[in-house]
Amino acid sequence: MQQYCISPQLNMISMKKVVLFLFFTSLFFSCKKEEVVPTDDNELITTVELIFTDANKKVSTFSFQDKDGDGKTPPEKFDKIVLDKNMSYSLEINVYDETKNPKANITEQIKLESDVHIFVFKIDPASLLSLKAIDKDKNGLPIGLLSSGSTQNVAGAGKLNLILKHQPPVNGKAVKTGNEAGGSSDIDLVFDLSVK
C-alpha cells in the first residue's frame, strides 16, 4: 500500500486558500440585496357595463367593449347613454378583461383594492345628470362602483366622461384622497349622453 505524505508547507498553503475562499464567499452571500417593491400595475379593462336603474325599477344597460384591449382596432361596442329627464337613478358599474378565457371580472379586483381605486364622473353640461358614489373604501373614501344621481327636468345632449383612477401609495404614502388627482387611469371613456 502506498502512502502519500503532504508537506506541512503545502498543507498550510491549501489551508490559506480554503480560508480565503470561505471569507470571500461569505462576503458575497452576506451582502444585502435591495428589497424589490412589487409594482401595482394598472388593470387591463376591455369591457365596461353601466347599469342604470330608475326610480320605477326600469333597468337600462349601456356598454363599452374593446376585446383586443390595446386600442389598435375600434371598439366592438360603444353605447350612447339615453336617460329620462326628471328621474332618479342608481348606477352600478361592472368591468371585465375579455382578453382572458374565461373573462376576468375586474370588478371584484377593484372591490378588493378599493383603497387605491376611484371612479370619477365628468358630465358636460353638468346640468344633464348628477352622479355621486355611494360605496366607500375602508378609509371612508368613495369608490364609485355604486352611485346614485338624477337628471333634471330639461332634455338635452352631452357627454359622460367615465374615469377609473388607479392610485396606489407612493413611497408608503397614500395617494387616494377621494378626488381625481394623483395616480393613473385604468379607464378614460367618453360616452355620448342623451336625456329625453
Where are these regions (language model features)?
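Bacterial Sec-dependent N-terminal signal peptides
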Residues: 26-50
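Short, solvent-exposed beta-strand/turn "edge" segments of beta-rich domains on protein surfaces
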Residues: 38-39, 78-85, 151-152
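Short beta-strand segments enriched for Tyr within beta-sheet-rich domains
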Residues: 87-91
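Structured interaction patches on ligand/partner-binding surfaces of diverse proteins
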Residues: 100-128
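N-terminal edge beta-strand
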Residues: 58-84
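Helix-rich interaction surfaces within compact, conserved domain-sized segments
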Residues: 123-196
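Short acidic/polar inter-strand loop motif in beta-rich domains
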Residues: 97-105, 167-174
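Sec-dependent bacterial lipoprotein signal peptides
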Residues: 1-29
